[in-house]
């Protein structure tokens, strides 16, 4: 490090960052990501946001203690090729870390293929967003600042949600609800279903399966 950064590189590290660098890593927790517990957070499970049973439920993860208004909000969308996955089994380190840092996080289920056909997935995600905007203040969240994230299929739905604000085609029955968000962070999603550049090998039957 001294060769690359100079002999005095330690002096350029901010004191608050230096304290974090000296902290010991709990290797046991990192090795068990599905049980990545955090102190100082509260989880509310299986809150209904729509009419499709367990597929239309969400969990809220927030700082423990009394509700404090005005906290930033994250809506997280799980992955799983639009066919598998659920809200309680993905991105737990991220969700719990943000809650410990003062965020209110809503992590959602949505209808899955092959039983659900396009555009059921994005309709559910938008309906969940509508619920969050209407109710998240009850849990301390600021409905005026909502970020969204998700990986794989969740990354695709994150991008689609961000790019189609207030689109009535994806908001049947709640066309008048504002579905704009303030930030979107998709991870490794699939974005080109028509393969305009000819990069996909093999059949496109998977797309037909979803639709």
Predicted feature residues:
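Alpha/beta-hydrolase superfamily serine-hydrolase fold, recognizing
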Residues: 1-211
């Amino acid at each position: 490090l001294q060769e690359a950064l100079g002999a005095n590189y330690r002096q350029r590290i901010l004191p608050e960052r230096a304290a974090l660098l000296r902290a010991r890593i709990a290797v046991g927790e990192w090795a068990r990501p599905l049980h990545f517990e955090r102190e100082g957070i509260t989880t509310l499970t299986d809150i209904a946001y729509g009419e499709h049973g367990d597929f239309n439920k969400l969990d809220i993860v927030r700082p423990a203690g009394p509700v404090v208004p005005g906290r930033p909000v994250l809506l997280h969308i799980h992955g799983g090729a639009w066919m598998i996955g659920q809200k309680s089994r993905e991105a737990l380190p991220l969700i719990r870390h943000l809650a410990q840092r003062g965020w209110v996080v809503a992590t959602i289920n949505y209808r899955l293929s092959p039983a659900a056909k396009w555009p059921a997935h994005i309709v559910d995600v938008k309906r969940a967003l509508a619920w969050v905007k209407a109710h998240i203040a009850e849990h301390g969240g600021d409905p005026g600042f909502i970020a969204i994230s998700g990986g794989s299929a969740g990354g695709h739905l994150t991008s689609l949600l961000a790019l189609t604000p207030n689109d009535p085609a994806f908001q049947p029955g709640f066309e008048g609800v504002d579905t704009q968000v303030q930030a979107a962070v998709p991870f490794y999603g699939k974005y080109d279903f028509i393969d305009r550049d000819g990069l996909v090998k093999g059949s496109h039957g998977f797309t037909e399966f979803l639709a």
